[in-house]
Regions:
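N-terminal secretory targeting signals
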Residues: 1-69
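Catalytic glycan-binding domains that act on GlcNAc-containing polysaccharides
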Residues: 39, 44-194
Length: 194
């Protein structure tokens, strides 16, 4: 045998040990807050924002995110803000695929991908806390529905591209990302609804 018993144990451990994902933050000279799971610049003053706890693992399947894990939070947010349960769930699926630690290239955070500049107005202290993120994200989407008079495609476009962008175009902005986003959310919405 080429690897022997130690090699087999090492390969087995690679598949069994859970991944770790500490979240770091820093504030730049303009006051912009940045989050990352990989601090890349040694000169930047990164601080640990969230220390990921090591979890027991039963193998690769135990690390999967299941789309029903946050249903109780979604139900509470849906009722509180008057947004349908399947729609909130569809937005979460499209935004983060139910990853509470998701960080987009543009800096959006958590399950509903809240932009850092919206955290204060949405009363979110910890954007990686599933309950806070879902409550704040649903509240923000309710604000978009109200602003765009309940028109779902415009509200989804505003959630994705920003309300001022939708105002500027007076319709869905002609961005492939936004058009694809609306289509994806609607597909998930109908799959959760029926």
């Amino acid at each position: 045998m080429f690897f022997g018993i130690p090699g087999i144990i090492l390969v087995a451990l690679i598949y069994v040990l859970p991944a770790r994902a500490d979240i770091y933050m820093f504030i730049d000279t303009n006051g912009v807050i940045h989050f990352t799971n990989v601090p890349t610049n040694a000169e930047t003053d990164y601080r640990i924002f969230i220390k990921e706890k090591r979890r027991k693992s039963l193998g690769a399947d135990s690390e999967k995110r299941y789309d029903h894990d946050y249903d109780h939070y979604i139900a509470e947010a849906s009722e509180r803000h008057g947004v349908s349960f399947p729609l909130v769930k569809a937005i979460i699926k499209a935004e983060s695929d139910f990853n509470p630690r998701a960080i987009s290239k543009k800096g959006a955070l958590g399950l509903m991908q809240i932009m850092p500049e919206n955290l204060q107005i949405l009363q979110i202290q910890d954007p990686f806390d599933p309950w806070e993120n879902i409550m704040g994200g649903t509240r923000y989407f309710r604000m978009m529905l109200d602003r765009f008079k309940g028109k779902l495609p415009l509200s989804l476009a505003a959630y994705n591209a920003g309300p001022t962008t939708v105002d500027r175009y007076k319709s869905i902005p002609p961005f492939k990302e936004t058009e694809d986003y609306i289509e994806k959310v609607m597909m998930y919405y109908y799959s959760y609804k029926y």
